[in-house]
Amino acid sequence: NYLQKRGLKPETMESFGIGYAPPGWDTTLQHFTAKGYTAEDLVNAGLVVEKQEGGGVYDRFRHRILFPIREMNGKMAGFGARRLNPEDEPKFLNSPQTELFDKGRLLYGLDAARKAIRAKDQAIIVEGYMDVVVPHQEGFTNVVSPMGTALTEAQLHLLKRFSKRIILALDADAAGEKATLRGLEVARQTLDRTEELSFDPRGLLRHEARLQADVRVTTLPPGMDPDEVVLRDPQEWQ
């Protein structure tokens, strides 16, 4: 299947809870209502969508690979869903903003990566879900993702709890380059600075703000995503 072709092992899929949303318009609805949940419960959880006309609801995720997104402590927050049919839009569909799911305050994989980030004193930021899962499978467990969006201050503050050494390993395309530049700018604006005294060329005392973090950018081979690099040659990623 798709995930096996992308290099995932069954135990990895199980570890990350990766699943599949069937193509039906009410499969999720029927499954959870049979367990006692109401349509309102499912709307609030972001699993179904209210119809704009005629009333009723329908499944949000259909014929997609589902990546559970968890809070830092492992608690479920929402889903990221990748299309299997290339004609479906959008390519990636996330849970909507809810009380449980605030995308800008979550990092995919942090629940699994936080111990390794602290132990290695280094966090690697990648773009997509597979870019997290494949490195973890191959033993590189300090990798997280902002889920395709630009880094936010809240996400960087999350990482600061575990390490201030951050590597940006975003896709080697135009969009990835822009995301890298945005990430560097957010890091520059967000991470702590200390005021140091120094002398300018005229011998006058001045204050300098020095970033209290080590933020670096790694260059990926052209046309390759992080998961592809890891599968081709783990030593190259290391």
Regions found by a protein language model. Name each.
Residues 1-14:
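Non-catalytic interaction/clamp surfaces of large macromolecular machines
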Residues 11-24, 217-218:
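Terminal amphipathic helices with adjacent charged low-complexity linkers/tails
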Residues 22-166, 180, 190:
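Phosphate-handling DNA/RNA-contact segment within nucleic-acid enzymes
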Residues 139-143, 183-188, 230-237:
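Short secondary-structure boundary/capping segments
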Residues 148, 160, 169-173, 181-183, ...:
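Toprim catalytic domain recognition across nucleic-acid enzymes
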Residues 156-159, 185, 189, 217, ...:
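Flexible glycine/proline-rich, aromatic-decorated loop/lid segments
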Residues 175-181, 224-229:
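Switch/connector loops and helix/strand junctions flanking conserved nucleotide-binding motifs
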Residues 194-238:
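C-terminal or mid-to-C-terminal helical accessory/interaction module adjacent to the motor/catalytic core
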